Amino acid sequence: HNKKLLFFCGSGNNGGDGLAIARLLLKERGNVAIYILKTGSRSIDCELNLHRLMELQALVHEIETADNFPEIDGEDVVIEALFGTGLSKPLEGMAQMLVQYMNESEATVVSIDMPAGLFADTSSKDCTVIKATHTLSFECPKLAFMMTENGEYIGNISILDIGLHKKYCEESITDTYSIDHESVQPFFKPRKAFSHKYNFGHALL
């Protein structure tokens, strides 16, 4: 609870999510530092959440050069909300430098929806990607989370419900599916304490 929280936000909707989280935590516990990577015009969502944050007289720093990088202590917690699932090309320039800088720190890194530098549905091999300790992703796992080469970047994954209509998710077209405990649970029937293994069929591997 006493750890300093450093938010690094982009200018898109993922950055807007980061600013919204920063606002809630600022009201809850303080000790929050907020940095926005200047990468072009801000999305409407980002602008809205920045405005709400400024109403709290929050101090927001813009990062334009490496000289604007803050000191990151090993005891700090970095919340990264730079690009999310909207990334379409490998990181370069100031974004790449910032991610490399964060990777050199020993701080705990929490990525929002998708670690910066990671593509949502293709391999990011040989790209610069932030090494998240935790990834808080929204509504459903991303294909990138299933790729072996991405294991060192995603850390511990939590899938969060953000209120999207269940029907929207169910009707989304995809050729990729995952199996979890909840989806297979109906196949397992209650067993008596003294049952024999041959009472429950056979499995062919």
Regions found by a protein language model. Name each.
Residues E75-V77, L82-G84, S88-T174:
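Internal gly/pro-rich beta-alpha loop/helix module
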Residues R42, K125-T128, K192:
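Alpha-helix initiation/capping motif
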Residues H1-A33, F145-L205:
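Small-residue (G/A/S/T)-rich helix-start motifs and N-terminal tracts that mark the onset
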Residues H1-V78, F83, S88-G93, M97:
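A cross-family phosphate/adenosyl-ligand binding-site feature
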Residues A58-T65, E92, G117-A120, S183-K189:
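Short gly/ser/thr-rich secondary-structure transition/capping motifs
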Residues F7, I34-I36, S111-D113, S137, ...:
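Structural beta-sheet core signal
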